Amino acid sequence: MTDNGTKDCKPASAKRYWWKAAASFLTVLFTMPLGHALMIIMEHAMNETALHYSAFAMGAAGMIMVIAGVYAKGDTRQTLWGFFGGLLFWTGWVEFLFMYYANRYGTQPQLDPVTGEIVTRPEYLIMPASFGFWMMVMLMYIFSTKNGCNFINWWQRRILRNRKNEIAARPMTRHTSIVTFMELIMILWGSYLLLMFCYDDNFLGDHHPVTLLVGLGCLIGSFFIFAKQLRIASWGANIRMAIATVVVFWTPVEIMGRMNLFNEIWIAPMEHKTEMGIVVAAFAALVIYLCAAARKKKKAVH
């Protein structure tokens, strides 16, 4: 998904950076439930008009943060700008916009036939319609960019074969903030598409063996990605790798939640204030630490 360059993803040595990998992983991981909780709180706290304006402003703020990251100094700072800007962009201009048009044109949620509870919200039911746009971006990355993304490189080796260096000869202009932003958006988007196609009874269904295998495969895959992340010395590159680790890891979490194997506290944050408060506090502490680490690194360079 990125044009990181191989230097970001390739381990510099056999040394393992447990604290950097754990801190990066947890920082990204905490954004998953917090993002869900934020959407639900906004829906309950705002009227419809205020919600739509706030969501659009959120997406705009995210875009501004990503652009600001282009001008920021330091790899870690640029990564953080791209990451947090990307989260606001995705929530405001993707998820909330899908919600707006799903509600405006009367898309009905998918209900549990036994309990009558909502199992899939309308905005996610229509999201698979964007598959063609996702593939359009992927075609550009596979055929037109030389980059350090293992997923894209895997496809390039199989599609382009011995002409890989000829067809995908050059990387894009590299801005770390944009790299992080695009990585986050494409991986989140791809994971939602994968889950929605798996949940669709016309394709598989949420209890289909293939859906369970997808969850198991992603769980196992996340450990392999984390093993690579452990060997990355740079904070910025470690955080970027953590995005892939977390989103792949979160896929089986979503599947298990869909099967009611555990209680998803983030879909009812007001009923789990203590637990969500702990997550917010831990997340804030990690973000402050990462910002301090970025500032310290910048001073060391100067």
Regions of interest found by a model, annotated:
Residues L38-A50, G69-D75, Y199-N202:
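Short, hydrophobic transmembrane alpha-helix segments
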Residues R121-I126, M138-A237:
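Long, contiguous internal "core" modules enriched in hydrophobic/ aromatic residues
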Residues V248-W266:
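Hydrophobic alpha-helical transmembrane segments in multi-pass integral membrane proteins
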Residues M46-G62, L80, D206-V214:
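Loop-to-helix transition at the N-terminal end of transmembrane alpha-helices
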Residues T2-T49:
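N-terminal signal-anchor module of multipass membrane proteins
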Residues M32-H36, A57-Y71:
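Central hydrophobic cores of alpha-helical transmembrane segments in multi-pass inner-membrane proteins
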Residues G215-L216, A268-I288:
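Small-residue-rich transmembrane alpha-helices that serve as helix-helix interface/gating elements
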